[in-house]
Amino acid sequence: TPLLVVVPTLEEAGRWTALLELMGWNQASLYPTSEGSPYEPFDPTSEIIWGQLQVLSDLLGDPDASSWAIVATERCLQPHLPPPDALKSTTRTLRKGDEVDLEELGETLAQLGYERVTTIEQEGSWSRRGDIVDIFPVSSELPVRLEFFGEELDKLREFDPASQRSLDAVDALRLTPTGFGPLVADQLRTLMPDGLERLLGDQATEQLLDGGTPEGMRRLMGLAWEQPASLLDYIPDTTTIVIDERRHGVAHGQQWLAHVEEHHLEMAAEAGLNESERE
């Protein structure tokens, strides 16, 4: 049975993850979360977002998995994610034998937020040399080298970014966006809700309308979707949920919510929103 362990702090989450690995779970994953307010005008660090995408990608790729465990703080229960269908619709899987147009693949990678470089060194980048494409997915621990025979994907191998040496062969490569911002931006471009320009400012609004992704899009997730998701929306219905140190977790959550409410009022006042618009 899949397992979700909810703990008060990230430090305890790290200890629980290590303990579950020692207990023999095939896959024990730490789901990182931010302690910052969701109304900050900037997104959480890449490490947090990429860590979340790694777990979410695994869940979307194998929704019926029964041998994994996830450990997270109570923050994972708060709405902070796009709905699963929205993330799944932008996720692409490449398998051996697939017919792939390399020019279209490059366009797809750009849309997902990947940066084209000469040599792969970190997550979120890709390169191409003839019929060889290297991609470092943000949802993977190692980059993958794709070798094509014409338009047919002939080989997929992980490789060491330091030495560029090929490692183990893999059956498939799952590509997610490099962050949640592009999904929010796409949805807002479709909806164009009232008050968006006032919230973003002229420059960011112009960037959005030009097809870009302004910084801090994640704070507008509640405008993009009527009900943003939490980790609970991604895990299987059969998941066993364990809450450790419940009182400590509740106290920690209440303290964070008080900070968030205060910050929300400050941001609304700065934006010049009236009482009804602040709700």
Task: State where each predicted segment sits.
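ASCE RecA-like P-loop NTPase motor cores
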Residues: 1-279
